[in-house]
Amino acid sequence: MDEVKYPVLTEKSIRLLERNQYTFNVDLQSNKTKIKNWIENFFDVKVIAMNSYRLPEKGGKRGSMIVHPIRCKRMIITLRTGDSIPLFSEQ
């Protein structure tokens, strides 16, 4: 699926792993329903809650033009107690 780009491993996302919350970068046009269905079917887990936010645009200059690259959306996915995504397992 092209809508889920990759998992995010930052200080905040590693702290959230202790609360059974996983962070992914997703496509800007994707919605929570599509992402929830894909996560539940692909990883065989139960999604309890989802939060999303857009990353801020970073301005830059290309010659005399000011450009704002398109950023992606970030989803924080909370799973049911006992479920985990093997991609983030410590083993």
UniProtKB/Swiss-Prot annotation:
Subcellular location: Plastid, Chloroplast
Plastid in keyword set: yes
Keywords: Chloroplast, Plastid, Ribonucleoprotein, Ribosomal protein, RNA-binding, rRNA-binding
Pfam families per UniProt: Ribosomal_L23
Nucleotidyltransferase found in the keyword field: no
Family matches, as InterPro entries: Nucleotide-bd_a/b_plait_sf, Ribosomal_uL23-like, Ribosomal_uL23/eL15/eS24_sf
Coiled coil: none
GO cellular component: chloroplast; ribonucleoprotein complex; ribosome
GO biological process: translation
Major place of residence: plastid
GO molecular function: rRNA binding; structural constituent of ribosome
Protein family (similarity comment): Belongs to the universal ribosomal protein uL23 family.
Summary of the function given for this chain in its UniProt record: Binds to 23S rRNA.
Subunit and partners: Part of the 50S ribosomal subunit.
Protein name, UniProt field: Large ribosomal subunit protein uL23c
Name of the gene: rpl23
